[in-house]
């Protein structure tokens, strides 16, 4: 059994919390996020920290308390520090260019792929083969990175494609005669 909900979420300086019923609002230096807390989870605000408790002791409620604690912790980290995901383009002629809220990708197709970034997400291209996705919502940053990777996932023979910076691509040997 996980005991995630027993650990309190520490609030760094500059992070404000508002709790109105089951609606939790977190505001920080980088922005603001909101979360609708499940009715079976009780949020307790102490000095400088948040604690979570299940209203009853059944397993689903305890699991929901742990999930809520993890989501709120990610929100606190997001509004104070932010999240980023790095992607690499591997392949001849593969390149990326960020133009405002549009990421233009050349991935070996007969046409360029233009990806419209959602609100709250910023893409930077330090080089033509590196993409940096930044934002305050951990789930959204990961989702955008996954959608960009899905345009051309790394293939196992030459390793060409879009990959996460920390991803290890399993390589296969070419077929022998």
From Swiss-Prot:
Biological process terms in GO annotation: cytoplasmic translation
PROSITE patterns xref list: RIBOSOMAL_L6_1
Gene Ontology cellular component annotations, sorted alphabetically: cytosolic large ribosomal subunit
Superkingdom, taxonomy of origin: Bacteria
UniProt keyword Ribosomal protein, yes or no: yes
Keywords: Ribonucleoprotein, Ribosomal protein, RNA-binding, rRNA-binding
Pfam families: Ribosomal_L6 (PF00347)
A single MF term (Gene Ontology): structural constituent of ribosome
Summary of the function given for this chain in its UniProt record: This protein binds to the 23S rRNA, and is important in its secondary structure. It is located near the subunit interface in the base of the L7/L12 stalk, and near the tRNA binding site of the peptidyltransferase center.
Subunit relationships: Part of the 50S ribosomal subunit.
The protein's name in its UniProt record: Large ribosomal subunit protein uL6
Organism the protein comes from: Pseudomonas aeruginosa (strain ATCC 15692 / DSM 22644 / CIP 104116 / JCM 14847 / LMG 12228 / 1C / PRS 101 / PAO1)
